[in-house]
Amino acid sequence: MANEKRQHPRAEITWPVTVITHNGPVDGRTQNISLAGTLIRCPEVPDLDDNFRLVFKPAGRQMLLATGEMIWSDILLDDKYAFYAMGVRFTYVPEHDQHVLGEAVLEHT
């Protein structure tokens, strides 16, 4: 994504993520991620509050925590399946998790 003009570049990183909703957890996967937010793919539409918690589970790393807000959502199609996608802007990421996230983004850009 070299031509991107974003303040925080995105990296194509696929991590398991759990979206914590008031109706319980919804599991999904990141499609890309930056220091400012992420694109999440889920098999179902999460029932979200204004701000919600995210638990990222990258392989070989500790879990990362964040709080976010949904900026957009859509139902998308790939070759065989429909899935729910949502763009999330982070509203809070603990300092240590920001550092780990930044290292992961640098490794993949």
Which residues fall in each region the model found?
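Hydrophobic core residues within well-ordered beta-strands of beta-rich domains
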Residues: 13, 26, 52, 64-66, ...
